[in-house]
Every structure is written in structure tokens, then in C-alpha cells.
């Protein structure tokens, strides 16, 4: 019986793992779609989903807790002004993990991690330029 299951080790030291998940969280909040390996994606979900739940209630204490995890003022602002209100009615499940084949060099399983209900980007300007 393993009490209090933690995060996977991912063959990294604890400081490297913390920094990697912090950088991946910031990238996901910035771009709302990232490509990574499947085990990293599953661990990233455990970090990102509680942060979005925290952002639903905009208080100084919650902003400080989010800043302690992200260490990026711009991402904390985006989290509380855009993402928190966007997912206010959703009770969880803010991320989607899609399997994306295997990496060329080492055959590692890859995945796309995206935030659900993200705005779709239209390619209309490219069509006008082609004409």
C-alpha cells in the first residue's frame, strides 16, 4: 500500500523535475497547446488542473499560491483574468491529452496537451494572401 501517491520521478532530480513542470505549466498557459511525451503530459495535468481551480476565485492569497508554483507574473495574471473566468462553470477536467504518435529518435510516445474550450484560430488571412 503506497500512501500519498506523489508525482512520477521521470528520471530527474527533484529540483529538475520541479523546474521542468513549472516551465511546461507556463508554456501551456501561454500557448494553450503543447507537445510533449505522454508520461510528462500525465504529470503536467496533476500540476495544471489545481492551479486553474485555484484561479476560479481571484483573491490575493490565491494569486500568491499560484505565483509560488509558476514564478511568472504574466502567467499568473493570465491565469486569473482569462483562464479562471473561462472555466468558472466547469467542475474540473480543464486539460485534454491526445496521443500523438512516437518520437523519431527514441520511439517515445508523444502527446498533445491542450486546454479544453480554447478559442479556435482561423486560417482566413492565409487564404486571402493566396488569391
UniProtKB/Swiss-Prot annotation:
Gene Ontology molecular function: structural constituent of ribosome
SUPFAM superfamilies tied to this protein: Prokaryotic ribosomal protein L17
Keywords annotated in UniProt: Ribonucleoprotein, Ribosomal protein
Annotated Pfam families: Ribosomal_L17
Signal sequence region: none
GO biological process, one term: translation
InterPro entries, A to Z: Ribosomal_bL17, Ribosomal_bL17_CS, Ribosomal_bL17_sf
Annotated GO CC locations: cytosolic large ribosomal subunit
PROSITE patterns, sorted: RIBOSOMAL_L17
Keyword Ribonucleoprotein carried by entry: yes
Record-annotated membrane-spanning stretches: none
UniProt entry tagged with the keyword Protease: no
PANTHER family xrefs: LARGE RIBOSOMAL SUBUNIT PROTEIN BL17M, RIBOSOMAL PROTEIN L17
Family stated for the protein in its record: Belongs to the bacterial ribosomal protein bL17 family.
Self-association state and partner proteins as the record states: Part of the 50S ribosomal subunit. Contacts protein L32.
HAMAP family in alphabetical order: Ribosomal_bL17
Full protein name: Large ribosomal subunit protein bL17
Organism: Cupriavidus pinatubonensis (strain JMP 134 / LMG 1197) (Cupriavidus necator (strain JMP 134))
Organism phylogeny: Bacteria, Pseudomonadati, Pseudomonadota, Betaproteobacteria, Burkholderiales
Amino acid at each position: 500500500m503506497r500512501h500519498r501517491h506523489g508525482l512520477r520521478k521521470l528520471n530527474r532530480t527533484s529540483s529538475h523535475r520541479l523546474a521542468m513542470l513549472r516551465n511546461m505549466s507556463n508554456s501551456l498557459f501561454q500557448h494553450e497547446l503543447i507537445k510533449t511525451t505522454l508520461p510528462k503530459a500525465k504529470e503536467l495535468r496533476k500540476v495544471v488542473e489545481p492551479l486553474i481551480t485555484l484561479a476560479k476565485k481571484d483573491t490575493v492569497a490565491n494569486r500568491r499560491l499560484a505565483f509560488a508554483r509558476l514564478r511568472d507574473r504574466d502567467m499568473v495574471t493570465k491565469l486569473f483574468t482569462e483562464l479562471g473566468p473561462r472555466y468558472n462553470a466547469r467542475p474540473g477536467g480543464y486539460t485534454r491529452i491526445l496521443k500523438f504518435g512516437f518520437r523519431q529518435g527514441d520511439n517515445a510516445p508523444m502527446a498533445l496537451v491542450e486546454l479544453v474550450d480554447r478559442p479556435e484560430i482561423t486560417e482566413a488571412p492565409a487564404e486571402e494572401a493566396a488569391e
